[in-house]
Curated annotation (Swiss-Prot):
In tachyzoites, plays an essential role in microneme secretion that ensures parasite motility and attachment to, invasion of and egress from host cells. Also involved in the architecture of the peripheral annuli where it appears to regulate the localization of PAP2. In association with the myosin motor MyoJ, involved in the constriction of the basal complex at the end of daughter cell division in an actin-dependent manner; the basal complex is a cytoskeletal structure formed at the tachyzoite basal pole during daughter cell formation. May be involved in parasite replication. InterPro entries: CALM/Myosin/TropC-like, EF-hand-dom_pair, EF_Hand_1_Ca_BS, EF_hand_dom. It is found in: Cytoplasm, Cytoskeleton, Microtubule organizing center, Centrosome. Residues 26-61, 62-97, 99-134, 135-170 form the EF-hand domain. It holds the Pfam family EF-hand_7. Monomer. Does not homooligomerize. It comes from the Eukaryota. One of its GO terms (molecular function) is calcium ion binding. EF-hand 1 domain binds Ca(2+) with low affinity. EF-hand 2, EF-hand 3 and EF-hand 4 domains do not bind Ca(2+). Keywords: Calcium, Cytoplasm, Cytoskeleton, Metal-binding, Repeat. This is Centrin-2. GO terms for biological process: positive regulation of regulated secretory pathway. Residues 1-21 are annotated as: Disordered. It comes from Toxoplasma gondii (strain ATCC 50611 / Me49).
Amino acid sequence: MQRGALRGASPTARRRLVDRPGLTEDEIEEIREAFNLFDTDGSGMIDPKELKAAMQSLGFETKNPTIYQMIADLDRDSGGPIDFEEFLDAITAKLGDKESREGIQKIFSLFDDDRTGTITLKNLKRVAKELGETMSEDELREMLERADSNGDGEISFEDFYAIMTKKTFP
């Protein structure tokens, strides 16, 4: 399989494929390679049987009903086989499932030691100190502002989750 298969895509298609929370461009390329490997007839589509084999090769233990439901949920075209973008949606959904969200919630709780449901400047100062990081208040305030989506001076769990699942930061 060729690395860099996204390079020939249009800028819009490339952005659509690469802008996936939790996935780097290289990871998307690996998923593309798995998709192509299991697209046994070279049609650019994977049927339920091919999808099951592809998901298992990527380390997901799935049963047939799950695969068929995934195809029904993701196939926006005709209820038949799925294309690469739909396959990538399935993988992205699997990676962003409940377990990873729960893991991020545990990390959030380590910051939110006063259990207010938000991370404040005070929380950031404490964590920086515990980690032995010497950061100025201005640097910590800037971190807070970058993650704070509504400008209230606090980082909600949703803000934190968005930052933790993003590969590039604003």
